[in-house]
Amino acid sequence: MLISLPKVRGIYRYDILMSKATWLNVGGRADILFKPRDIEDLTCLIKNTELPVSVIGATSNIIVRDSGIRGITVKLGKEFAYIKSKGNNSIVAGGAVLLSNLAHFAGNQQISGLEFLVGIPGTVGGGIEMNAGAYGSDIASVVQSIKAVNLEDGNLYEFSSEEMGYFYRGHSLKGNWIFVEAEFKGVNSEYELILQRLKEVIERKNKSQPIRGKTAGCIFKNPKNYRAWELIDKSGCLGLNIGGARISKKHCNFLLNYDNATASDLENLGNKVKDAVKDKFNVELEWEIRVLGSY
């Protein structure tokens, strides 16, 4: 069946194998991948299509199911990878900017407070969506304002950090959004001190996480009053595997694709861990990794 797509200035690509595009190297085919030229191009697409629209960023925290993704998958490209200083220790960044690049840019501007981002392998847009954080800091603590396009009506909105209603690994906005730009604010500091903190974050991550494996970051959010990895460990899940998927022995809140795992292997293993923790502690773990696609 032929589908009429809106006329855009960006790029449509078709039948994209997502296992070649995700950090976990799993997933079926996306029907249509769209990279908009700018915000206007993005809003034009959403307002003029009846197909379902999904959003991906760096694909560092997603499992795309083996069945793939139906409809249109939007990925912000280089046109949204800009960073600029506004003065007064403020930075404006597009939604496609890597969080690690934002941290280094801030350091070069002698702006402190964003160092924790250097160890998070995602984009500004994805980080805003999940209130990404590490080592006691999170996006909510440094973001000032956000521009977002609503996936239902296609309109552009701007929100303050307070209006986002941030909480641990999430926000309170209703509906589905794609975050296209954000303004961040830090504090002035000496470059050498910032550089040292950046190195400390990287070293801490390298020591505690399986950075050389095919992973998607932490599997589960930390439940209130608990650490997910401790619950997983005490539930006997360290090194557990299904097919080519394994729970990391270095950090048991990480899934590994260690031997040509399928998306089903990874998702089933995560759910097996959830069940084990529920049985042992009566605590319900919540996925931090996003799962895209239908069964």
Curated annotation (Swiss-Prot):
Q: Does the keyword Hydrolase apply?
A: no
Catalytic reactions on record:
UDP-N-acetyl-alpha-D-muramate + NADP(+) = UDP-N-acetyl-3-O-(1-carboxyvinyl)-alpha-D-glucosamine + NADPH + H(+)
GO terms for biological process? cell division; cell wall organization; peptidoglycan biosynthetic process; regulation of cell shape
* Cofactor(s) annotated in UniProt: FAD
> Which SUPFAM superfamilies does the entry link to?
FAD-binding/transporter-associated domain-like, Uridine diphospho-N-Acetylenolpyruvylglucosamine reductase, MurB, C-terminal domain
Q: Where in the cell is it found?
A: Cytoplasm
**Main localization of the protein?**
cytoplasm
**Top EC class, one word:** oxidoreductase
Instruction: Name the UniProt key words of this record, in alphabetical order.
Output: Cell cycle, Cell division, Cell shape, Cell wall biogenesis/degradation, Cytoplasm, FAD, Flavoprotein, NADP, Oxidoreductase, Peptidoglycan synthesis
Its Gene Ontology molecular function terms? FAD binding; UDP-N-acetylmuramate dehydrogenase activity
Top-level taxon of origin: Bacteria
Q: Which Pfam families match?
A: FAD_binding_4, MurB_C
What is the active site of this protein?
169, 218 (proton donor), 288
Q: In which pathway does it act?
A: Cell wall biogenesis; peptidoglycan biosynthesis
Q: Which family does it belong to?
A: Belongs to the MurB family.
Would you tell me the protein name for this molecule?
UDP-N-acetylenolpyruvoylglucosamine reductase
Which organism is this protein's natural source? Answer: Wolbachia sp. subsp. Drosophila simulans (strain wRi)
